[in-house]
Amino acid sequence: MNIQDFYDFLVREEAYDASSLNCFAFRHGYDVRQGLSLSLGNMVRGFGFDLQGIHFHNSECAYIAGAFSNGTDAHLAIQRQLVVCDNGYAAKKSIRKPYESLKRSDWERFNKQWMLYVVWQKCLGNGVFRNLLLSIPKDAVIIEDSTFQRGSTATVWGTRNDELKKRLNDLRKELKAQGMCKAAIKREQDKMRLGEWATIGVFKGQNLMGKILMTCKQALEQGTEPPIDYALLQDAHINLLGKELTFNQYVKAA
């Protein structure tokens, strides 16, 4: 698949029918389906990696760093916070959000390819994450389940499943009426979502994160690399901690 074909695939709206596809939809870092961990999201802790000599504790912080990569003093200060942050949720809420007005004006031009590059570096640089991704069945459709998220990009990076949402909401009301506490209700919802109800409904959205993960997984399996647009990233002049990154190297997993 060439770079343009990959971009078209990446931004295409999808409708994954859970009744006919082997959907591995992740929402939380502790999700488990068919005995396999779904700790695949950017926010998940514990999968640190180096990106051209700079260590990040999680891929969310590395991704956000690209939005503030003009090399200005303000951007350097933000990046220093991101490098030491070990919590992707905190980075998004407490580091990115307050400085949203300072992000690069051309961010949307290269952010998808930057995410692909970041996740690929995570695959190359963290063996535990790499093996986790490779453990997902070959016929699985990896999906970011953002059904209960309200953000404008919920169905860009992820998907929504309205039928499953209704089932889970009805279950919550039923269990609440029985006097079950909030934590117990959530556990029961997760159990059904990842088990008996995993084949319910249709996941709709672009699912960029799921597609990027599947693309990286396939590259690892084939001993190749994803169709990263290195020319676009090089042209973006991405600076990290005072160093402009270069994108002319081809690296495979060890």
Residue map of PLM features:
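Charged, low-complexity intrinsically disordered segments
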Residues: 1-254
